[in-house]
């Protein structure tokens, strides 16, 4: 496909953006337009994060359980979502878009607030969960960057893209998932809820799609620092 004919839906869930984000988005929009991309921006907000993400796909609960993104009325090639606290460059955004040529689902990496981990889980290690009460996030100092594209079980949706046809194959509402139940060694039943991004990644896997991260595509993650 000629990239100069691609229509990219850029989802910006949220209602407050930093000056850095606005600068980065403005520069990216100029560069995307210059390169011939058609950009459709979807800015939506809800206090319930799952609804924010659903709204950026043009979803409406009144259309029922069999609905598809944008009611099937928007001809697009890539749906790409950027969280309001992500710091990115135009070339990173373009690389993420172009990666969808090779991978139906692809994401960049960004650090969590502890600075020691990425918002990514390589695999759902149940034994680790039983011991720690959480799954094991990828460590920054252990990332193998010689493997540019890596399959993961989960990556946060802060800088994330899907080729058209992927989400259409999921079951609405996409961002919810059944409770996860795990039996501990002492027989106790552990019950865990999925966040909306974990739910989305699990739904992708259930539909036969791998989540791939570009390990060279590391973006910033703005957080408040109290001094």
Regions found by a protein language model. Give the residues of each.
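Short, conserved alpha-helix that lines the donor NDP-sugar binding/gating region
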Residues: 49-72, 202
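Short beta-strand-to-loop acidic/aromatic patch adjacent to the donor-nucleotide binding site
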Residues: 66-87
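Conserved catalytic core of nucleotide-sugar-dependent glycosyltransferases
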Residues: 89-182
């Amino acid at each position: 496909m000629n990239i100069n004919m691609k229509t990219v839906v850029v989802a910006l869930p949220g209602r407050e953006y930093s000056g850095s984000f606005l600068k980065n988005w403005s520069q990216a929009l100029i560069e995307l337009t210059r390169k011939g991309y058609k950009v459709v921006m979807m800015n939506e907000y809800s206090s319930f994060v799952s609804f924010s993400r659903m709204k950026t796909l043009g979803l409406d609960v009144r259309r029922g359980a069999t609905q598809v993104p944008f009611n099937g009325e928007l001809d697009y090639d890539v749906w790409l979502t950027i969280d309001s606290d992500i710091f990115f460059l135009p070339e990173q955004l373009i690389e993420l878009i172009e990666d969808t040529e090779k991978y139906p689902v692809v994401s960049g990496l960004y650090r969590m607030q502890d600075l020691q981990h990425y918002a990514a889980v390589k695999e759902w290690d149940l034994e680790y969960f039983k011991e720690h009460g959480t799954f094991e996030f990828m460590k920054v100092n252990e990332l193998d960057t010689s493997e540019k594209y890596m399959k993961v079980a989960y990556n946060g949706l802060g800088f994330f893209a899907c080729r058209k046809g992927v989400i259409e194959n999921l079951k609405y509402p996409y961002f919810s998932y059944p409770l996860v139940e795990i039996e501990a060694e002492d027989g106790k039943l552990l019950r865990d809820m999925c966040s909306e991004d974990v739910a989305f990644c699990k739904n992708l896997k259930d539909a036969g799609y791998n989540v791939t991260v570009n390990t060279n595509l590391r973006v910033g993650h703005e957080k408040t620092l109290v001094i």
